[in-house]
């Protein structure tokens, strides 16, 4: 059944609002929040290449796997610190990104079953033609600077809305890939495992041990 564009937009908005909110569970040592899977190959010229794994609405969703529901990036930044994650520094002047190492998992319902996979499983490494190897992600913490939206200094992720990056050349995501690549086309969506567009998922972040 086809819906008018306006109704389809309302249905999409309702689905976004139903996503899990940000939860900081200090006892369990977890930060969780809801997201949804994104449409792949929005721009064919990119040939499936992505630069991010998690974006907020208004971020570069056409180069990402997951988009969050309503989320305050600053609260996420502070929430990660509450579970013991210490922010470091984005890559700069030839030095790679630094910061606490994180383990990030994606959970979703597949029929009657609940599935859970490391977030890197959703990335295809074009150099090996295999899923990205398991890594511990870096809590770099985002570069600071002027944010037009609030007319003040702050974390630039608030403006870019790209939470988790695959290349260290973008210093604005809170979380980045430990592989010190600055830019490129190495990473693509692993379509073999990514659930269909719009599937609700839960992002689970823990300090790596």
What are these regions (language model features)?
Residues 3, 7-19:
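Bacterial Sec-dependent signal peptides at the C-terminal "C-region" and cleavage site
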Residues 17-209:
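Long, low-hydrophobicity ectodomains and other hydrophilic envelope-associated domains
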